[in-house]
UniProtKB/Swiss-Prot annotation:
Hexane cyclase; part of the gene cluster that mediates the biosynthesis of xenoacremones such as xenoacremone A, a compound that shows inhibitory activity toward the PI3K/AKT signaling pathway and which has the ability to induce apoptosis of A549 lung cancer cells. Within the pathway, cooperation of the hybrid PKS-NRPS xenE and the trans-acting enoyl reductase xenG is responsible for the formation of the reduced tyrosine-nonaketide derivative. The alpha/beta hydrolase xenA then accelerates intramolecular nucleophilic attack to give a pyrrolidone derivative. It comes from Xenoacremonium sinensis. Disruption phenotype: Abolishes the production of xenoacremones A and B. Pathway: Mycotoxin biosynthesis. This is Hexane cyclase xenF.
């Protein structure tokens, strides 16, 4: 790199750090009232879990991996501690693959050294014109309301809020957001049953004790394997965003932060004709170098294959996964795959289903330095039963590759952008250059 380029990078880095610190110092903890629209729906049969930005339990807490608890119920109580965390995730992609949305609500003290607490909302929108909205918002307080018929949550501060509402049969979800850059919501209608990491259906009667574990320390529930999504939102500029597509909802919780859990992960949610696909691939750091998988394949919303077996078997259903490198688009970090090949197999039925996933749109990228980072894509998907009809569809994927340690100044740039408020999306491009 030339001296001029080095100087520009240094000046850019200095400006970014100054902006983050300035934004951090100007923020004060808030105590907004809980919005009225949910008060009308809960009663004494509901339980309420409240967590403010600075509620971190000192020492061991109650951590549940029970397969019988509702997927969206709170798993960690009374609060997260310095290491464990939980997340509620919802996503959707338009039928064209050009517009997409992802929302994740977290209670996570991993980055408590920022001084902004443990409540985050990660919010990504990709628009058909190629523009991207990236909201990483640190919030003042959160509530999760668990009622007989629904689970609801809200992460809010005085000038912005994000909320979700999911029925207990996991067939319907409603999400709303009111932030600095975008306001609106989306609905999700699913006809797939909720499932657990081992492929078993979720029921209140429970399943195997380890049914929720996708890899050591990481737990997973599939609330919606495939859902119709309807998005309606308005940007601060006045531009309206509407699209229909497919998506789903995933629940994650863990005993440790991501950097202690794994080297990285790859996640796919896709559809093609009557098929819906959800796949998780985690390279563990707890079991050094061991790869763990969880795959679900639905046909007309009924589960065909659900398995944590990631190698060929004569008896058990399994799923195989390989990266491909012969396409046109890859991420800008170390992992240069252009797509993936998935194979689901059922030896008992003597059937296999294969799907090729090819990146077509980069939805977001966040760097961690030295070629490490995270990339999200929209994808073209082609596949079906081997020897049968092949279908074409779309999907979303995310891939990460993390170092064992990220210097705090880099975390400040990546995650600390949540302090920058309205300007953070624009600064993301400079961060990508610096890292």
């Amino acid at each position: 790199m030339s001296p001029a380029a080095n100087m520009f990078r240094t000046l850019t880095l200095t400006a970014l750090v100054s902006a983050v610190v300035s934004a951090y110092e100007s923020q004060v903890p808030l105590n907004p009232q809980f919005p009225e629209y949910l008060n009308e729906e809960w009663d004494d049969s509901c339980s309420i879990s409240k967590s403010t930005a600075y509620d971190v339990h000192d020492g061991p807490n109650t951590f549940s991996s029970s397969p019988s608890e509702d997927i969206h119920s709170v798993k960690i109580s009374p609060h997260v501690n310095a290491t464990n965390w939980e997340q509620w995730e919802f996503d959707g992609l338009s039928h064209t693959g050009l517009s997409g949305l992802l929302m994740a609500f977290s209670r996570d003290a991993t980055y408590a050294f920022f001084g902004q607490g443990n409540l985050r909302v990660e919010f990504y929108i990709t628009l058909g014109d190629g523009s991207i909205i990236q909201e990483l918002d640190f919030i003042s307080e959160s509530y999760v309301i668990d009622c007989p018929d629904f689970t609801a949550g809200i992460w809010n501060s005085t000038d912005r809020s994000y909320s979700f509402y999911v029925t207990k049969d996991h067939q319907f979800a409603r999400l709303k957001f009111d932030s600095w850059r975008v306001r609106g919501g989306f609905t999700m209608s699913s006809s797939t049953r909720p499932h657990l990491a081992d492929g078993s259906p979720w029921t209140p009667d429970g399943g195997k004790p380890d049914a929720t574990e996708v890899s050591p320390g990481l737990f997973y529930g599939l609330s919606m394997g495939g859902a119709e999504v309807d998005v309606d939102a308005t940007l601060s500029s006045g531009k309206r965003i509407t699209f229909k597509g497919r998506g789903g909802s995933t629940r994650l919780w863990a005993t440790e932060g991501w950097l202690k859990l794994c080297d990285g992960w790859k996640v796919i949610r896709a559809w093609a004709g009557p098929y819906s696909i959800v796949y998780w691939d985690v390279l563990s750091r707890i079991d050094r170098g061991v790869r763990y998988v969880s795959g679900h394949l639905f046909y007309h919303d009924e589960l065909l294959v659900g398995s944590r077996v990631g190698q060929p078997s004569d008896k058990a259903d399994y799923v195989l996964f390989n990266d491909q490198f012969d396409g046109e688009m890859s991420g800008k970090y170390k992992d240069k795959n252009t797509g993936h090949h998935l194979e689901f197999a059922s030896p008992a039925r003597d059937k296999k289903w294969t799907f090729d996933v090819q990146h077509i749109v980069t939805q977001y990228e966040i760097g961690a330095g030295a070629g490490f980072g995270m990339s999200g894509f929209a994808n073209r998907v082609v596949g079906g039963e081997v020897g049968g009809v092949q279908y074409e569809g779309k999907g979303q994927s995310e891939q990460t590759y993390w170092p064992e340690h990220i210097e705090e100044w880099k975390i400040w740039l990546v995650w600390g952008l949540g302090f920058l408020g309205r300007g953070k999306t624009y600064v993301m491009k400079l961060v990508g250059y610096v890292l």
